[in-house]
Amino acid sequence: DVLIVDDVQECDRAMKFYNALCPYYQNNMIEIRQSEPYSYCQFVVGRDHTAFGRARHPFMTGSGGWAYFSATGYMLGIRPDFEHLTIDPCIPADWKEFSAVRRWRGAEYDIHVENPDGVMKGVQELYLDGEKVERIPVMAQGSRHDVRVVMG
């Protein structure tokens, strides 16, 4: 399960699972898959069937939503709750940085995560608009903020 990434060693494994399920990485068999190259499908026909490998019902599944939820909330680690925006990535060690934009409660957060030591999990420093903070609170609607995260 991609959502369960609470152990540091699971971060690389979660990325491998995510990539295995990602439609982009299945484009090398598009003639067999016979589905849009960008869509998650409800099911893929099993090996005992004559249509083995074909993907069906691309827009009748919750897989796309769950893939987004898993990737943004648990791998990139950007999770809103009632009072705070948590950023706690669980990424492959070879990712040196990534950026994301998150709109939450009417405010926009430009998030840049740095990983100078090549760790898979652990936030060393968190900055909101250049000021070191412990947590990111709800900000005013219509406002825009820079968030810098240093892993380590």
Task: Describe each PLM feature range.
Residues 2-152:
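Non-catalytic C-terminal accessory modules of carbohydrate-active enzymes
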